[in-house]
């Protein structure tokens, strides 16, 4: 059995040809397509600084984890090692768990918690730790955990979309879902239609997934920030802005605070 540190010790291999450009980098494009994580992470920390000061400084942890995902993903695609796969998936799990803890509206908490966020954070932390430990024994556990969280987030977003009349929030949800759907299509196509893409010499769908998901996450985070503000920041008005300019057709969203606890 190969070492978990060894090149190509992971059972996962993507459609891109291995070691095509360097004997040190297994998947060249899949490795370097993670660079946007290191650009958007610090930029979003800067743009969201006033909001984080008001809401919670733990928001910075989310963006640090976002950059760690980029780092571990680079390591995984560079080596295709089992350790790299685990680190990549575990970092995603902790990112989602952190976002859950900060932005999950209390009305979606399990009823036995009575809307207590501190207890909810403990529950999420314990669940994430257990899932992390189990992933070393059974790597498929992480996949189930990630899919469960993703489906629950999608459910919450759909519920909030139905309830809100806020045009900015509805627009953000629509853009986030479209970006996520296109990114997921790229990921699935790379996995299931690899033989077709190899025949036409197009190996870049997983790289496109990296770029799209690195853009989708800021949209998703700002979406959850707006949803959260409805319940946790009464009296504050959040305005969605876009970097570098609001007038540009494409931009990176963030919230500006310009300033009725609400029920689900």
From Swiss-Prot:
GO terms for molecular function: metal ion binding; N-acylsphingosine amidohydrolase activity. GO terms for cellular component: endoplasmic reticulum; endoplasmic reticulum membrane. Mainly expressed in epidermis. Its cofactor is Zn(2+). Keywords: Calcium, Endoplasmic reticulum, Hydrolase, Lipid metabolism, Membrane, Metal-binding, Sphingolipid metabolism, Transmembrane, Transmembrane helix, Zinc. Inhibited by sphingosine. Activity is Ca(2+)-dependent. The chain crosses the membrane at residues 28-48, 58-78, 82-102, 120-137, 139-159, 177-197, 207-227. Ca(2+) binds at residues 13-14, 16, 18, 27. Its EC number is 3.5.1.-, 3.5.1.23. Optimum pH is 8.0. Residues 1-27, 79-81, 138, 198-206 are lumenal. Zn(2+) binds at residues 77, 206, 210. PANTHER family: ALKALINE CERAMIDASE (PTHR46139), ALKALINE CERAMIDASE 1 (PTHR46139:SF2). This is Alkaline ceramidase 1. It comes from Homo sapiens. The lineage of its organism: Eukaryota, Metazoa, Chordata, Craniata, Vertebrata. The gene is ACER1.
């Amino acid at each position: 059995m190969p070492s978990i540190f060894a090149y190509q010790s992971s059972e996962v291999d993507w459609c891109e040809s291995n070691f095509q450009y360097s004997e040190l980098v297994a998947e060249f494009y899949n490795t370097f397509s993670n660079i946007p994580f290191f650009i958007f992470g610090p930029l979003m920390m800067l743009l969201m600084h006033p909001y984080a000061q008001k809401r919670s400084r733990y928001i910075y942890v989310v963006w640090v984890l976002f950059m760690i995902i980029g780092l571990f993903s680079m390591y995984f695609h560079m080596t295709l090692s089992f350790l790299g796969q685990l680190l990549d998936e575990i970092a995603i799990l902790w990112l989602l768990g952190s976002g859950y803890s900060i932005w999950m509206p209390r009305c979606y908490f399990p009823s036995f918690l009575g809307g207590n966020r501190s207890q909810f954070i403990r529950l999420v932390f314990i669940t994430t730790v257990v899932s992390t430990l189990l992933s070393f024994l059974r790597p498929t556990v992480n996949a189930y955990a990630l899919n469960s969280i993703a489906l629950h987030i999608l459910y919450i977003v759909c519920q909030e979309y139905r309830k809100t009349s806020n045009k900015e929030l509805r627009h953000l949800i629509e853009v986030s879902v479209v970006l996520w759907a296109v990114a997921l299509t790229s990921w699935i196509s790379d996995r299931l239609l690899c033989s077709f893409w190899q025949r036409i010499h197009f190996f870049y769908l997983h790289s496109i997934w990296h770029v799209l998901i690195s853009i989708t996450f800021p949209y998703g985070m700002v979406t959850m920030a707006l949803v959260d503000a409805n319940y946790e920041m009464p009296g504050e008005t959040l305005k969605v802005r876009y970097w570098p300019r609001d007038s540009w057709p494409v931009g990176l969203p963030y919230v500006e605070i310009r300033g009725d606890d609400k029920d689900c």
